[in-house]
């Protein structure tokens, strides 16, 4: 203890227990909320007024904390501004220089950094969606509504720094709300920092000579010891399909109605996700009704989906609100920084959007399509993509080239009257197009043989980046007569 002007004070300590610091934070938050409630009786507070109020409360509480021998960290200022503005921890995350994207998926926050990819950052505060919709509306842009549940907005956010200065950040908000996101709001914020004079002075090609981005985090694929039985896949075929997805390939699952396309796709996707830390792979799922459920999620909008986004279409109803199409949802997906997009059933313009997405780096993607054979996948795809205005203006050879660049492999499933459910064929899609036929080239890797099951054809995968050695699977699994 020591005395200043007759006042007894404890020595200020920077190191305090987490419980004590949390208690002081609660005092700060309670007093901030109380003062805001009083001020709000007169008028609605602007973001600048909330910042001033938060700094004032921080100074007042800090003086009392010093009397008790505690020094409150200045980071509490930004945390308090977030608390009072309804932004919660979002403001602190936007302020961080290493974060490029922030995702609010139902009740949970994920952040994307160049070094670590997607990571879970904790629960989202209640009312965060309301706060963001107000921000969008005040900026004179269209906020999402149940009639128009998808919105894309570009805002400027003034982020207060602890030293009293303010940093301008650009935030692009992609917002999907019910009914398009049936379990709750799905929001992605892409954060960009405006360059300061200091940045421009020190930002030159010298940085590129000294630094580089780290490798994309990807686990080494080790073939799984799947049991051999009377199922539709052999261990060899299962490991090939799984390795393709783990390495960021795009898979087409084709078949007739009721053949089990969706179920097979779901099992392959889940096995792929299990190779990564939970939440590290972000998938955007688009369906007419939600059938694909991953990561053991129970459908509760307050529980963590593991960074999986579930969206559904809304059909056109005469006299009702505008439809929400798969095309709309995929375009929204591409603003959400997903690793992959999954379509329950491609039958229109959305098929072309997915191909374009897969060709530009959104691997780990998959879609199902109705077809009567593996060879029929191409003409069926060519038929459905004509609904897209861009594809309708392109030649068949151009569409074939895009398909070949994007799709890694295709699986054909049928429910046979004699044999039941079978995988009739698994083909690799070559990057080389058959120009005379104006179609992609399919190389059969596994074919169903009556009495034997799904057997290797002897062809080896030759697609660059997806050869046996690239996939870390033995070439022997493709040997005919295995």
Please place each PLM-identified region on the residue numbering.
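P-loop NTP-binding catalytic core
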Residues: 116-126, 133, 137-247
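Switch/coupling sub-region of P-loop NTPases
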Residues: 238, 248-254, 263, 267-404, ...
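Short, well-ordered beta-strand core segments
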Residues: 410-412
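Conserved glycine(s) of the Walker
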Residues: 260
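Residue-level signature of catalytic and energy-coupling elements of molecular machines
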Residues: 102, 175, 362, 407
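Flexible glycine-/small-residue-rich
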Residues: 104-106, 113, 155, 177-179, ...
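N-terminal accessory targeting/assembly segments
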Residues: 1-161
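NTP-binding/hydrolysis catalytic cores, primarily Walker-type P-loop NTPases
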Residues: 418-482
